[in-house]
Amino acid sequence: MNAVRRKKLIWVAATLAGAIIAVLLVIYAIGQQTDYYFDPTAIAAGDAPQNKRIRAGGMVVKDSVRRDPNDDLKVQFEITDFNATVPVSYQGILPDLFAENSGVVATGEMQGKVFVASEVLAKHDENYMPPEVAASLKEDHAAKGVTPTSEQFSPAIPVKQTAGEGNHTTSTLQE
């Protein structure tokens, strides 16, 4: 093998090795940033891993919010999907929209039977429910054969575009 060919072969091998290492590092980084979602039923069943970052979502149980009298930032509350309830411990400032009987998604890890949250996100208006929570509740209601009375599970009414006067269009609700 002559020197030019050998040099090209080494260059191609080094480039290929570098590309493989870069791809593996990207895959590793994505894996580290992935947070799996668990509803309270799955957490109570023991499906959620211990001491691994996950997301948990549900409705805050009424009268479950307790603040530590010695530390104003330490809060304990419970979340439910109406099948199971999970205790949550959080150290920090809760979002302004955090309230009992409202939807939350918390990021943290399971430590024993308690979900220790590092971040708590609250719903942003009175009609919003996190998509994962809504899907979980809808599945639970379907499994029980219960039709939810809440409009939170109803699909949005499609909007039909009709031609109006001039260069604009008018939106009307389809029936």
From Swiss-Prot:
The chain crosses the membrane at residues 9-29. InterPro entries: CcmE, CcmE-like_sf, NA-bd_OB-fold. GO terms for molecular function: heme binding; metal ion binding. It is a single-pass type II membrane protein. GO terms for biological process: cytochrome complex assembly. Heme binds at residues 124, 128. Residues 142-175 are annotated as: Disordered. It comes from the Bacteria. Residues 30-175 are periplasmic. GO terms for cellular component: plasma membrane. Keywords: Cell inner membrane, Cell membrane, Cytochrome c-type biogenesis, Heme, Iron, Membrane, Metal-binding, Signal-anchor, Transmembrane, Transmembrane helix. It is found in: Cell inner membrane. Coiled coil: none annotated. Residues 1-8 are cytoplasmic. Signal peptide: none annotated. Belongs to the CcmE/CycJ family. Heme chaperone required for the biogenesis of c-type cytochromes. Transiently binds heme delivered by CcmC and transfers the heme to apo-cytochromes in a process facilitated by CcmF and CcmH. NCBIfam families: PRK13254.1-1, PRK13254.1-3, PRK13254.1-5. This is Cytochrome c-type biogenesis protein CcmE. It comes from Psychrobacter sp. (strain PRwf-1). The lineage of its organism: Bacteria, Pseudomonadati, Pseudomonadota, Gammaproteobacteria, Moraxellales.
